[in-house]
Amino acid sequence: MSSCVLDASALLAVIGCETGWQSVVENLSNALICSVNLSEVAAKLAEREGLTIDDIHLRLSQYELRVIPFDERLAYAAAALRPKTRQAGLSFGDRACLATAAACNLPALTAERAWKQLDLGIKVNVVR
């Protein structure tokens, strides 16, 4: 049974051993991630570490995450969150994670402190 939906920042915290990474590791074995957020993580690894996509895929596959495709339903759900999250500075990727969490009826797990101030009816756990 799945425990949460990971934001890119949460997975990047694990990869970089950043503050809060231990809280994320506790949830990794049952975590989901939206394909948008997986792409964000892959892009950061390519940019920061110069890894090839094959190397990134190999590295990320060790976490055995279940990837949720970002489909039309989630696209509209993420768009609907824009007016409610704009002032907090949330990105498209952030809204994709929140929309996925809402659709799966699971909490979102993030390292982004700005999410603490949100009142969206979506459970959010901040690891920092």
What name fits each language-model region?
Residues 1-2, 28-31, 64-66, 103-107:
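Short active-site oxyanion
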Residues 10-11, 37-38, 74, 96-97, ...:
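Alpha-helix capping/helix-boundary segments
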Residues 38-68:
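Active-site-proximal, substrate-binding regions of enzyme catalytic domains
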Residues 98-128:
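Acidic, PIN/NYN-like endoribonuclease modules and their adjacent C-terminal/linker elements
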Residues 1-33, 46-58:
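Short, well-structured N-terminal submotif of metal-dependent ribonuclease cores
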Residues 6-7, 33-34, 90-92, 112, ...:
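Histidine- and aromatic-rich ligand-binding microenvironments
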Residues 66-109:
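Active-site neighborhoods of divalent-metal-dependent phosphate/nucleic-acid chemistry enzymes
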